């Protein structure tokens, strides 16, 4: 069963690109929704992971300008698509996905991400088989798959359909970095937390030996996997507040593009 969870709309504002020109002020409104696939009921002991191959995690964006849809025939759409495409390095190098495709479908720009850390076989080893073998065990998490992050952004400009593309990029970076830090890392660390995914990448080969060393069986595998996901020290907020040595903090300059002026 699939269900959608929508986050509160966020509003951003910036002045004109030249001398903080008030006339060139740009406003934007951002709304994001995640799609979750899994059992109908949820509880506090849920483990969220990205949709695994052959499925892929989709990052989907569509754009509006002054409440009007920006369509793929427009030059502005092309420039915004280039901005979205510039995030490939972030998804691949910091969150350990492979970007399989950057496509345009029905006026949406879609990134298709393949997880390089988890597979269905590993989920079977870590969760499904221990659950079947140890029916008496408690504390096992229920698996849910995050299949899509969909974002709609509405830009507002006093100058009609004129917008500096270089002025748009900070809005992209500020929104997505704040969304990841304040929401996605806490709710879906195995999908969007660099440190959680990095720890899983480093530690997954050690989980089975630890479980068998302590219990002579696989009973602890689901619990240890869930412990990695639930460790709040993996969040960027924790790393910043503690200012301690540890895994590197993410670089949130996610989007980039040389300054280009668009005028319809």
Swiss-Prot record:
Its Gene Ontology biological processes?
Answer: meiotic DNA double-strand break formation; reciprocal meiotic recombination
Coiled-coil parts of chain: none
Q: Effect of knocking it out?
A: Reduces meiotic recombination several hundred fold. Specifically affects meiosis, and does not have any detectable mitotic phenotype.
Q: InterPro entries attached here?
A: REC102
Q: Does the keyword Heme apply?
A: no
Keyword hit for Nucleus? yes
What Pfam families does the database record attribute to this sequence? Answer: REC102 (PF21736)
Classify the source by domain of life: Eukaryota
GO CC annotations on file: condensed nuclear chromosome
Cellular location(s): Nucleus
- Could you list this entry's UniProt keywords, alphabetically sorted: Meiosis, Nucleus
Question: What function does this protein fulfil?
Answer: Required for formation of the SPO11-mediated double-strand breaks (DSBs) that initiate meiotic recombination. May mediate the interaction between SPO11 subunits during meiosis. Also needed for homolog chromosome pairing, synaptonemal complex formation, and for the proper timing of the first meiotic division. Not required for mitosis and mitotic DNA repair mechanisms.
Share any extra remarks. Despite weak sequence similarities, may correspond to the subunit B of a SPO11-containing topoisomerase 6 complex specifically required for meiotic recombination. Retains some of the structural features of the ancestral archaeal Top6B subunit (AC O05207).
Q: Which family does it belong to?
A: Belongs to the TOP6B-like family.
Q: How does it assemble?
A: Interacts with REC104; seems to form a functional unit with REC104. REC102-REC104 interacts with SKI8-SPO11 and this interaction is required for proper subcellular location of the proteins during the initiation of recombination. Interacts with MEI4, REC114 and SPO11.
Its recorded name reads Meiotic recombination protein REC102
């Amino acid at each position: 069963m699939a269900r959608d969870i929508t986050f509160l709309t966020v509003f951003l504002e910036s002045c004109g690109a030249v001398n903080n020109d008030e006339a060139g002020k740009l406003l934007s409104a951002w709304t994001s929704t995640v799609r979750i696939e899994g059992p109908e009921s949820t509880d506090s002991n849920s483990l969220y992971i990205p949709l695994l191959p052959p499925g892929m995690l989709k990052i989907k964006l569509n754009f509006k300008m002054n409440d009007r849809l920006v369509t793929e025939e427009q030059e502005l759409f092309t420039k915004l698509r280039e901005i979205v495409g510039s995030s490939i390095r972030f998804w691949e190098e910091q969150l350990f996905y492979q970007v399989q495709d950057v496509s345009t479908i029905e006026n949406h720009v879609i990134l298709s991400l393949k997880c390089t850390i988890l597979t269905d076989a590993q989920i079977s080893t870590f969760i499904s088989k221990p659950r079947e073998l140890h029916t008496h065990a408690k504390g096992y998490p229920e698996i849910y798959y995050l299949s899509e992050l969909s974002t709609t952004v509405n830009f507002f400009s006093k100058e009609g359909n004129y917008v500096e593309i270089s002025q748009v990029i900070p809005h992209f970076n500020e929104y997505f970095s704040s969304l990841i830090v304040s929401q996605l890392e806490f709710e879906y660390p195995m999908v969007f937390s660099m440190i959680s995914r990095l720890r899983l990448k480093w530690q997954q080969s050690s989980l089975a030996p630890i479980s068998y060393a302590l219990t002579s069986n696989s009973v602890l595998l689901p619990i240890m996997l869930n412990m990695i996901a639930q460790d709040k020290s993996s969040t960027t907020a924790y790393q910043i507040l503690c200012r301690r040595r540890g895994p590197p903090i993410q670089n949130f300059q996610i989007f980039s593009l040389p300054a280009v002026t668009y005028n319809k």
